[in-house]
């Protein structure tokens, strides 16, 4: 697997995508580069180096040798190395240190030199995304959003808002499936018009029933499903929506300076759930064309998919998790819009103190009321 380290064309320092400038920036010589310049520069550089395929082949051969050696070890050694086998190890192209990742990680940061590392082969071939929405919210702005939410929480534990939590805030690109469809549909429905009036003490109701026929072309865009297992579903769903008008054709350089995950849920695994949702949307769209009725009940509905397009998309999320009283609490911020989602801990001591203050205030009011009536 090839590791890619995007370096500044001017000084060779690490190059990262800057959400504020929407350009690629070097923190050392303060240079900024457009996405096109970066792509052209590294495309020319890649032609002078060994191809990623050759490197991957070598590592595959090495992995086979290691697997053969591992097979000869005893059961005890296998048990001890189980955790190591589940991880994947690469060498940092900047300092040579070992970078340990999970099987789905596509971009990360070297723990030792803090330089960004992009695992090129993870997002190539069939796993290459169609598009990416770059981070628009910088880490500092994400921290400001986090602090803004914390200020509204009166019962946070003391010293909860600290630098250690800010350090853990990580920008991650998560994979999603997006589907656009065009359908031709026909509907037969029963429409009711109800009219009521009063004459004297009598109340009258008239119900007229109509047979409705509708036909037309329906377009449903941007129906999404997550493409990664093992993550908090609510967290990844609730930071939506994203403005897909700001999506770019995928380029590996956008991952520099952030973490990224490769999909491990395939299109066929979510197709049924997506179709069920689109069916519901389409039927509701057809019902909405029958206006002016008190009630509309579908009698017969059928449609045909005329066009369908799936897009494998990476979306930006700022993520932090923290442990409080043995419970892991996730917090996420939409890296494009700043929308927040998460659960913040509650201090039992502050709750008790607040309850005591309220009780004391009520008791004081009761005593005051009693004195007034003496």
Positions of predicted regions on the chain:
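Short cysteine-rich clusters marking metal-coordination/redox-active sites
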Residues: 8-11, 26-29, 92-95, 110-113
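Extended hydrophobic
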Residues: 311-361
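Short functional micro-motifs and their immediate structural scaffolds
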Residues: 14-16, 34, 100, 118
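Juxtamembrane boundary at the C-terminal end of a transmembrane helix
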Residues: 364-374
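Charged, low-complexity helical/coil segments in non-catalytic cytosolic or luminal regions
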Residues: 127-323, 328
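Short linker/helix segments within small regulatory modules
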Residues: 16-24, 101-108
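Residues immediately within or flanking Cys/His clusters that coordinate Zn2+
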Residues: 3-5, 21-23, 87-89, 107
């Amino acid at each position: 697997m090839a590791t890619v380290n995007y370096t500044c064309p001017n000084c060779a320092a690490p190059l990262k995508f800057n959400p504020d400038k929407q350009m690629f920036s070097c923190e050392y010589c303060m240079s900024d580069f457009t996405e096109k310049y970066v792509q052209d520069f590294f495309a020319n550089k890649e032609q002078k180096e060994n191809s990623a395929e050759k490197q991957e082949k070598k590592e595959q051969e090495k992995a086979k040798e290691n697997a053969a050696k591992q097979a000869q070890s005893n059961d005890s050694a296998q048990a001890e190395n189980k955790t190591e086998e589940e991880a994947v190890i690469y060498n940092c192209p900047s300092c040579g240190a070992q970078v340990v990742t999970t099987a789905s990680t596509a971009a990360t940061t070297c723990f030792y030199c803090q330089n960004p590392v992009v695992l090129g082969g993870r997002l190539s071939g069939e796993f290459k995304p169609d598009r990416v929405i770059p981070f628009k919210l910088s880490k500092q702005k994400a921290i400001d959003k986090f602090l803004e939410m914390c200020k509204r929480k009166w019962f946070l534990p003391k010293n909860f808002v600290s630098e250690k939590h800010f350090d853990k805030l990580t920008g991650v690109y998560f994979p999603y499936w997006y589907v656009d469809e065009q359908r031709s549909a026909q509907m037969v429905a029963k429409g009711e018009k109800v009219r009521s009036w009063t004459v004297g003490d009598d109340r009258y109701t008239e119900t007229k029933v109509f047979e409705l026929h509708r036909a037309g072309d329906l377009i449903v865009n941007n129906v999404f499903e997550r493409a990664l297992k093992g993550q908090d579903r609510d967290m990844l769903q609730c930071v939506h929506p994203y403005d897909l008008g700001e999506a770019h054709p995928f380029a590996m350089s956008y991952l520099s300076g952030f973490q990224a995950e490769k999909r491990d849920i395939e299109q066929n695994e979510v197709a049924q759930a997506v179709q069920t949702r689109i069916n519901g949307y389409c039927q509701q769209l057809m019902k909405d064309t029958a206006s002016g009725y008190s009630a509309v009940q579908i009698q017969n509905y059928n449609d045909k998919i005329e066009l369908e397009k799936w897009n494998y998309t990476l979306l930006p999320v700022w993520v932090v998790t923290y442990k409080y009283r043995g419970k892991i609490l996730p917090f996420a911020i939409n890296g494009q819009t700043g929308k927040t989602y998460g659960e913040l801990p509650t201090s039992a001591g502050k709750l008790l103190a607040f309850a005591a203050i309220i009780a004391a205030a009520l008791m004081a009011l009761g005593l005051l009321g009693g004195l007034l009536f003496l």
